[in-house]
Amino acid sequence: MSSQAEPSKGASNADPNEKVEKMHLPTDTAGGGVKVKVKEQEASPSDKNNLNPQSAGVSEVQVQDDTGARGSGARDLKVPKQMQAPKSSEEKSDVDGVPTRPVSERELRKRDAMQFIQRHQKVRNILAQYCPWLTDERLQLCIELKILFMQHFQDSRLVLYTAVMSFLFGYLRFGFLSLFIIMAVCIQYYRICDRRVKVNFKDDYTRYLSTRKLENDSETVTWLNTFLQQFWYIFEPSLSERITEITDQILSENVPSFIDSMALSEFTLGTKSPRMGFIRSYPKTEEDTVMMDLRLAFSPNDISDLTGREIAACIKPKIALDLKIGKSIASAKMPVLIEDLSFTGNLRVKVKLIDKYPYAKTVGLTFTEKPVFSYILKPLGGDKFGFDIGNIPGLTTFITEQIHNTLGPMMYSPNVYELDIESMMGAAGLNTALGAVEFKLRKGDGFKDGLGGAVDPYVVIKNSADRVIGKSKVAHNTGSPVFNETFYSVLNSFSENLNLEVYDFNDIRSDKLLGSAVLPLATLEAMPVTNDAFVELTLKGKTVGRLNYDMKFHAVVPDSGEEITKVDGPGVLQFTVHQCKELSNDPSKRPTAYAKLIINNKEVYTTRKIKKNNNPSWEESFGTLLPEGKNATLGVQIFTEESEHPFGTANVSLQDLFAATKTGLLWFPLQHAPSGRVRMSVMWKPAQLNNDSISSMALATPIGAIRIHLRSANNLHSKIPGKKCDSYARIMSHNTKQFRTVVIASNVNPFWDEYMYAPVITKHDIFFLQVMNYNSSGEDKLIGQTPINISNFINQGENGALMEYHDPRELTVPLSSTRGIKGNATITFKCDFFPSAVTTSLSPDVTPAPKASSTVATDKVNIEVLPESQKTPTAVDNTSTSRGSTSVKTSKPKKISELLMPSEAVNAALDFESGFMGFDIISYKIAKPAQELAIFLDDLPHHIFLSSALNVTGGATLHEYGNTFIRQLEYSQCTFKLLDGDKEVGSKTMLSRDLISKGATKPLEIAFPDGASILVAFRLTPVPVKLEEVEMYENMGEMTVDVIKATDLPAADSNGKSDPFVVFELQGEEVYRTKTHKRTLNPTFNESFEVELPCKQTCNFVANVFDWDFGNKDDHLGSCVIDCKLLQQQQQTNYEIPLDSKQGVLYLRITLSPKWVLRSKRAGNSSLVEGILGQTASIVGMPLKGISTVGNVAVDGVASVANLTNKMRKGISRGFKGIHHEKAK
C-alpha cells in the first residue's frame, strides 16, 4: 500500500492539529482510496521542553472511503451550469457556501395554499359555478375539514364497526358466540390493511433508499462490460472500416501541398473492448432529461482479466498512415504507425428526450476532468525500424498539451459537445420545414465598377446557413441588368434570411463583389406575398445599387397523421446524395469526384470535391418547391477531374425514389460507367401554392407598437476630418425607415429627447437604431447602429394575449458598424411595447386586418414596398412605403382598396385615441405632370409620405401605401401638399379623425385649389398607448406674451437712472426685444408678441433686462426664468418675477393657445435647417425631391432669413436713434 499526502482544500480554515492524508489503494477504480483524518493532541505546558512528551499524541483517527467517482483532484474542471447535477434537498440548502434565503411561515402557508387549490381545481370549478360566495380561503378550510374527517374516520372505522355490530348482534339476541364471528372478521380486515400498509411502505422506502443511493454512490457495471466485450468482436470490424472511409475522405480534402496523398493503410482498435469503471446516475433531473457520469477506460494492453484463449487470439490496436511525398517518379511512401493506444477519463452525459422518433433530441458530452492518453508513435521506420518519439524528452508532454488544447474548447468542462440526434437520424430537416420561399429576381440598377465603367453582374442567393440556393445568369456590359429568374428555398424558421450578393463576372481574374443585401423572412409570417419590391445593396457602408424582386411563401400542408404513400401535386422536396462506392476497380487509382443534382433535366446543385477517394461521401442536400411532383424526374451525375464528361449517371423518377426511400433501397448503379454505385434519398412534403398577388407592408396588421425614447448619443465621430457631426437618429425595420429625429448641428454629443413609434409586425422583428451624419449635398453616412430584438419585449398572458412591456431602465449601448465592429460611440434610449387592440370586429373582409408597415421620416432616396425584417438593413428610403408599392393591382377587381373596413369596425376603432393609420393613395387627378404628393402629420417636421412622380395628366390609378402612428386622434391633423419641384401647388389640412371616419368605409376625395384631387382610403389599427406628458398636444401651443412693466430696476447710468429694454430668449434663441425706455427705473412696456412653445415641460424661456448704452456693450440689469409649466390652455397666467440681481421685478401676462408645434423647434439653435420648404415657412423637415437645400446653416428652427434681416434693421435703427439722442442732450 502506498500513501501520498494531499492537502485538504479547506486547510486554511481547519484545525491546525488536524492532518488529512489520502491513502491510495490498489483498487479497481482509478483515483480510489481512503481519506485518513488524524487529530493530534498538544503537549501540556510542562512537557513542551521534552523531546518525547507524554501528554502529546493522537487523540482521534477518522477513516473515510473515497472512490474515484467524484473526480481526480488536480485534473478536475469546472462543470457548466447546464451540465450540473441536480442537488438533493440537503445540498440545496447551501450552494457554493452561500445559504439560501430563509422562507417565512407566511410564505410557506401561501405557497401551500396555492398548491392545495391547484390539486383540487376540479372541485373549485364546480363550487365556483354553484357557490360563487365560496372564496378560495373558505374552500380550502372546507376541504381541509373534509380530509381531516376522512383521515380520522379511516383510523377509527374498525372500532366503530366492532361496536355497532356487537350492539346489533346483542340486540338481536344472537348470543355470546356471535362476538367471535365479529372478532374474526375484524381481525382479518386488520391483517389485510396492515399487510397493505407494510408492503406499500416497504416499496416506497426501498425506492427512496435506491434513489438516494443512485444520487450519492456510483454503480459498477460488470454486466455491461461483459456484454460490450462479446459485442465488440462483431462490431469492431465494421466500425474500423467506417472510420477508415471517413478519415480517408477528410485526409484527401486536407492534403498539404508538399504531400501527394495521405491514406490509412491499416486501422484496427483491437479485440479488447472499452470498459466502464462505474456509472453514477442523477434521478432528480427533469422528466425529459437523463444525466449520468461514466468512468471510461480503453486499455487494450491490460490482459490481466482475459483468459488464455482470449490472450492467444488478442489483437492490439494499430493505425498505419501512408504518406506519399513528392510527385510521380520522385515520390516515396512514408508509413506512420500508432500503437498501444489507451485512454481513461470521466465523462458526463446529458440526454434530452422527446416523444417521437428518434426519442432523443440532443446528447451533451463533457469531460469533468482532463482525460489521460497513452500511445506509441513511430513516424519513421515502420514496424521493424520504427522509433517511438515518446522517448524524446519533452515531446510527449508537448503532444499531450496539443491534444488537450484541441479537445478542450470542444468538450472539456465548461465546454459541452452537443450532438443533435434528431437531425443526425434524419428526423429533422424537412420534417421541421414550414414551407418554401419563392424568390423571383426581376432586375437591378445602379451597378458600376470602381471606375464608373460597365460591369457583367450576376446575383448569388444564399440561405442563413450560407449555402448557395441559386445563381442568376450573367448580364454582360450593363449596369441595369434584367434577370427574370425564379429560385426556391426551404424555410424552417421565420428567423432565417436570404442573402443576396452581386458579383462582376470576369474571365481572367476572380469575380469582384459589387454589393450585398440581407432579406429577413420574418414578415412572411404576417405578409406571405411581396410584389415589385426593392432592396438596396451596400458595400462598405455605401449604397451601390438595388434589386427588384417578388417573394412568396408557400406553406406546407399540416400533418394529418396519415403516412404519405405517393407523390402528387405541389410539394417541398429535399433531394440528398449521400455517397458513392467503388468508382474504380483499381485500388491504386483514387479519383477526385463531385456530384451534380438534376431535377427535371435541370442542374440545380453541385457538391464539393472529394480528393482522391474511391468511396467519396458528400451527405449534401438540396431543397426546393415543385409545383407538380407526380411526373418529376431526379438524377445524379458523377464527375471526376480527369474528364469534363460525366463519369456516370443515375436517373430515377421522384415517385420511384420516394418509394425506395421508404423501403431503404437507396443504392443505384451508375449508368455508362465501368463501375460504381450511388446512394441517394428523397423527402417529400405536400404544400399549398400561394397565388395571391397583393402585397404591401401597409396591408400587414401590426401586433403592437414599440416606443423608443431616444435620449442622446456620445462620442460620435464624423468621417470628414476637422468637421463635427450633423447627426440624427432613425429606426429601421423591414428594410424601411420607420421614424427619424431632427438633425443636431455640429455636436459630437447630441441630445434629442424624442419619442419614436414603429409598428411591430411579428414577434421576430428586429429593429435597428441608427445614427446618421446628415449631408446636404450628398448621401447621409451611417455613423453606427445597434439592433433591438423585439422578442425581448413581448410577453404573453395566461390566455395568450400580448402584454405591455415597460422597462424603467435607460440603456446605454455601443454603436457598431454594419460589419459588427464596435467603436467608442454610444447611444442612450429606453424601450416600451404596447400591443394592438385589434379584435375580430375590427378585421376587414379580407385576411386579418391590414395595418401599416410604418411611415415617417423620409429621406432623399425612396423605395417601393420594402420587404422585411433585418440583419443589417440598408438605408432604404423613407418610412413605411414611401414611393411605396407602386402600381399594385388588387386581386379582387371589385374592391377599390384593401384598406376599406365595415362601418361597425370603423366606429369601434375610433373609440381609441391612438394607433396606426394606414392609407392607400388610390388615384390622382392633376393638370400638370411631374408633380408629387407629400403628407405631413402633427408636430413632425418631416413628411411621412412622398409619392412617386405623378406624370399622367387628367387622372391615373396609383395605389401607393403608407402608414403612420397617431398619438392623439382627437387633436391630430394631417396636411396634404401637392408639390411642383420646389413650389407648393396646393395644400389641404384635415383632422385625422375626419379622414378615418370618412375614408375608411369608402374612398375619400381630397381636392386642391387648382382643381387637382386625390382619392384616398384609410384604416386605423388601434394601439392603446399611455403617453408621456411631454408628448401630449396640451403640452405645446402658441404663447401670447404681454410685457406689462418692470419696477425698481437697478440704476446703471451716472444720473441714477437706466435706459431699460427686455430681451426674451426661448431655448437659447432671441425671440423678441422690447423698445428702450429712457431714463427710468420703472418702465411701462405694454407690448405684446407671439411665439410658439414646443414643450412647456422642457423649454427654457428667459427674460433678460438690459440698460442701453451708446457705443458700448449694453449693461445687464438682471434676468429671470419664466416657468412655463404653470401655463394652462386658453387661460391667462400672470407672472410677477423678481430679477436675479436681487433688485427689480418684471410683470408679464401669458396666454397659451393650443397648436401643434414642430418638434424641430425644441432643440433651439442646435437644430439644423435641412431645406426651405416644410409645414411652415420658418422650418422644414426632410428635403423633398427636387427642392433646394440650405446646408449646414445652424439656426434654431424659429428664426429664418427674414428674422436675421430684422435683427440687422433693428441694430442699425438703434444706432441712428442713439446718435439723435446724444445730439438732443
UniProtKB/Swiss-Prot annotation:
The modification Phosphoserine is found at S843. Its cofactor is Ca(2+). CDD domains: C2A_Tricalbin-like (cd04044), C2B_Tricalbin-like (cd04052), C2C_Tricalbin-like (cd04045), C2D_Tricalbin-like (cd04040), SMP_TCB (cd21678). InterPro entries: C2_dom, C2_domain_sf, C2A_Tricalbin, C2B_Tricalbin, C2C_Tricalbin, C2D_Tricalbin, SMP_LBD, TCB1-3_C2. Keywords: Calcium, Endoplasmic reticulum, Lipid transport, Lipid-binding, Membrane, Metal-binding, Phosphoprotein, Repeat, Transmembrane, Transmembrane helix, Transport. Residues 1-15, 43-65, 869-890 have a biased composition (Polar residues). GO terms for cellular component: endoplasmic reticulum; endoplasmic reticulum membrane; plasma membrane; plasma membrane of cell tip. The keyword Transport applies. Ca(2+) 1 binds at D1053, D1059, D1107, D1109. It is found in: Endoplasmic reticulum membrane. GO terms for biological process: endoplasmic reticulum membrane organization; endoplasmic reticulum-plasma membrane tethering; ER to Golgi ceramide transport. Residues 1-104, 867-890 are annotated as: Disordered. PANTHER family: TRICALBIN-1-RELATED. This is Uncharacterized protein PYUK71.03c. It comes from Schizosaccharomyces pombe (strain 972 / ATCC 24843) (Fission yeast).
